[in-house]
């Protein structure tokens, strides 16, 4: 499965530290890597491609790029959730289960967790209010 890492706050050589953290977890995802950094947070990701092999690079954003997602796992009911979110007006750029999480969080906030079926761990950074939501499956 994929791997994610990150830290908050300012540190010396932030980009180098994040790159090193991401390299340490290369065995979790050899197919690609992704990064997100701003003044408050740094997140890294290693991807093992399973679904939507060409379009699943992370981070994943919502439509206006106010929410940033790093995700590890598999959401079994993502097609059902995607359909429901699409009917509510959400616009999807990929066919990934990852993108369902960011739009689901945008729509339902923490209640998203009660709708998910699968195995997962993820972090969502809200750039607007500078809050971090981290969750994992119940098992």
Regions found by a protein language model. Give the residues of each.
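N-terminus-centric sequence/structural signature that marks the extreme N-terminus
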Residues: 1-139
């Amino acid at each position: 499965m994929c791997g994610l890492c990150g830290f908050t706050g300012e540190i010396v050589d932030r980009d180098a530290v994040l790159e090193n953290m991401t390299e340490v977890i290369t065995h979790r995802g050899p197919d690609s890597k992704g990064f997100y950094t701003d003044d408050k947070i740094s997140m890294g990701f290693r991807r093992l491609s399973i679904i939507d092999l060409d379009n699943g690079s992370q981070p994943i954003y919502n439509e206006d790029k106010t929410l940033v997602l790093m995700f590890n796992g598999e959401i079994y009911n993502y097609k059902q959730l995607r359909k429901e979110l699409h009917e509510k007006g959400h616009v999807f750029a990929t066919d990934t289960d990852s993108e369902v999480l960011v739009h689901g969080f945008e729509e339902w906030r923490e209640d998203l967790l009660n709708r998910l079926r699968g195995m997962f761990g993820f972090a969502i950074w809200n750039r607007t209010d500078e809050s971090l939501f981290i969750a994992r499956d119940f098992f």
